[in-house]
């Protein structure tokens, strides 16, 4: 199945010069959405994954069904102030400055094998911060999976030492 047929490209959104890749049409089509989830779960099935981790918000949309498909748990990565218990955090660089991500300090146990799932690999900042938190907690990043990679933004560099899968590529 060619999943690129289920991605809407919106030019000049959210600002001039940017083409936003909208996954809403993919999610609206049950067959395409299921296919994408199964493809990521298939990638993970031989990696002895203990936990799926996904950054808000679209990492939840993709990561939770992958976790269900694998029969394992899901741990959310959130912006500061959104999680009610003790957290670990990591800063990452965005095009307009620093930002921070957090996850519960008890979300990953030492030695657990983790799959990071998100909708988009762009610059790699989000996944790099997520990896930092998982490893700070003693987890092992067994793989990363993304629906889309924006090729020109060099996000692969951030995960060059990790196994990963990308379902679709678009220009950055």
From Swiss-Prot:
Catalytic reaction list: AMP + diphosphate = 5-phospho-alpha-D-ribose 1-diphosphate + adenine
Localization in the cell: Cytoplasm
Principal cellular location given in the protein's record: cytoplasm
Keyword Lipid metabolism carried by entry: no
GO molecular function: adenine binding; adenine phosphoribosyltransferase activity; AMP binding
Similarity comment text for this entry: Belongs to the purine/pyrimidine phosphoribosyltransferase family.
This protein's name: Adenine phosphoribosyltransferase
């Amino acid at each position: 199945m060619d999943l690129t047929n289920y991605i809407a490209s919106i030019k000049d959104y959210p600002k001039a010069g940017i083409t936003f890749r909208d996954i809403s049409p993919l999610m609206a089509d049950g067959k395409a959405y299921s296919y994408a989830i199964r493809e990521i779960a298939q990638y993970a099935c031989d990696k002895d994954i203990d936990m799926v981790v996904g950054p808000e918000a679209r990492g939840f949309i993709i990561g939770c069904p992958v976790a269900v498909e694998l029969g394992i748990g899901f741990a959310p990565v959130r912006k500061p102030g959104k999680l009610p218990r003790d957290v670990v955090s990591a800063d990452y660089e965005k095009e307009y400055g620093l930002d921070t991500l957090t996850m519960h300090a008890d979300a990953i146990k030492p030695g657990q094998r983790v799959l990071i799932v998100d909708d988009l690999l762009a610059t790699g900042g989000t996944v790099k911060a997520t990896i930092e938190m998982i490893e700070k907690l003693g987890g092992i990043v067994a793989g990363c999976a993304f629906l889309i990679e924006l090729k020109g933004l060099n996000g692969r560099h951030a995960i060059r030492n990790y196994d990963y899968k990308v379902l679709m590529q678009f220009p950055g």
